[in-house]
Amino acid sequence: EPFCISYHGVSRANVKEGDKVLVVGAGTIGVLAAIAAKAKGATVYISDVSEGKLEMAKEFGVDGTLLNDSPEHFDKGVAELTEGNGFDVTIEAVGLPSTFQNCIDACCFGGRMVLIGVGKKNLDFNFTLIQKKELNVFGSRNALKKDFLELIDLVHAGKAPLEKIITNVYPFEDAAKAFADFANNPGDMLKVVFDFSGINK
């Protein structure tokens, strides 16, 4: 289900072979969006504030990473990765005003930008850049039946290493510890699975 959310967003942005894509946010949804974009033939980079998350993202075949530790470093990295042109597609997978602005700044003229991250704060951003750059901005939530069907084919074709997404397995009796660990996630946890095999029926 999380993969379908990411895949639907990538499809909304019409990611295709030859596109240069930047995913902003290397959590579960962001990493899955990167996998989906790679499967569609794009060159994919992923950005995050956490070096640990970026190291983990490399295991999923992204073409490069960009540490977003300051606006200056982010902008410089985008310019270097795109020869100053910007990315064809930017994917917002965090839901913060700052990462929304990152996606606007990193997108090329006439580029596509899709919002997957769910925000809780009102946005305060430079909307004139959307006009000046003639950006195409897409919202995305959940998924469609066709997304599930296409993903089944993708998994069967071996283009989606989903087994790597499950980074931690806890016995059910350790559920409280699992939630505490995830709340303090240093960046090396993506999806957590509970093992119910030890429960007496």
Where are these regions (language model features)?
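Mid-domain Rossmann-like dinucleotide-binding core that forms the NAD(H)/NADP(H) cofactor-binding site
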Residues: E1-P71
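Glycine-rich cofactor phosphate-binding loops and adjacent beta1-alpha1 units
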Residues: A13-N14, E55, F60-N136, I199-K201
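Glycine- and other small-residue-rich loops at beta-strand/loop junctions that grip anionic moieties
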Residues: L22, A26, I46-S47, L66-L67, ...
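Anion (oxyanion) recognition and catalysis
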Residues: K38, Q131, H156
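Residues in the short beta-alpha loop(s) of Rossmann-like NAD(P)-binding domains
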Residues: S50, G119, A143
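C-terminal hydrophobic helical "lid"/dimerization subdomain
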Residues: Q101-D105, K145-K201
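Glycine-rich phosphate/pyrophosphate-binding beta-alpha loops
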Residues: N136, N142-A143
